[in-house]
Structure formats: structure tokens, C-alpha cells
């Protein structure tokens, strides 16, 4: 009897852990309400820009400067992205911690695995 009770409690704890680890998914417009969360932002990339310093910006929810959200790829990580223009016009899922930069939400992307084309 104790074994069955323990097994049932273990299965419940395991299920609760799996649910807790599932990341929330938001649109570009919703991201600003979830600053500080580790989440996934899924939306269409409306513009891709690479700065003279090598930083890459994927603007979602509108074109710069009216975008709702930005996936920022620092120049130190940009080498992992051989063709950032491939994201333009496509729906992507960007995962990481949502932060604010100049009043707009962003996720800093340091690994190619953080962006998935849907």
C-alpha cells in the first residue's frame, strides 16, 4: 500500500514539474506585459537589420521604430547566424528572458537554438 501511495505522489510531482517547466508563449504585442519572464515570443518578423557594429535586430510586431518587440543578436553571437535575412517575413519563435530596452521589450539571443522558424 505504501508503495502505491509513494508511486502516485511521485507521478503527481513529476507531472507538476513538467507543467512548471513549460514556457509561456506570447505575441510581440503581449511581450511588454511579461518583462522579467523567461518565455517564448512568437510572431512575424517585419524587419531585419544588421548594424555597422555587427548587431542583428529582428523586429516583430511592426517595422522599426514602431516594432512591438525585438530579438537582439549581439555582434559577439552574430557569427552563428549566416543568413539573418532568412527570418524576414517569416513567423519565428524566440526564447529567452524578456527585458526592456528604451521602453520596448526584447530578448537577447546568444545562441541560434533560441530562434525557431515556424
Each model region followed by its residue ranges:
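Bacterial N-terminal signal peptides that target proteins for export
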Residues: 1-8
Amino acid at each position: 500500500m505504501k508503495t502505491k501511495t509513494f508511486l502516485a505522489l511521485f507521478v503527481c510531482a513529476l507531472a507538476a514539474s513538467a507543467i512548471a517547466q513549460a514556457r509561456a508563449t506570447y505575441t510581440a504585442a503581449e511581450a511588454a506585459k511579461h518583462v522579467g519572464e523567461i518565455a517564448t515570443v512568437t510572431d512575424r518578423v517585419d524587419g531585419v537589420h544588421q548594424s555597422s557594429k555587427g548587431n542583428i535586430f529582428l523586429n516583430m510586431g511592426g517595422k522599426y521604430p514602431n516594432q512591438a518587440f525585438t530579438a537582439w543578436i549581439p555582434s559577439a553571437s552574430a557569427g552563428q547566424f549566416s543568413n539573418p535575412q532568412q527570418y524576414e517575413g517569416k513567423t519565428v519563435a524566440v526564447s529567452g528572458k524578456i527585458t526592456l530596452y528604451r521602453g520596448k521589450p526584447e530578448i537577447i539571443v546568444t545562441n541560434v537554438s533560441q530562434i525557431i522558424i515556424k
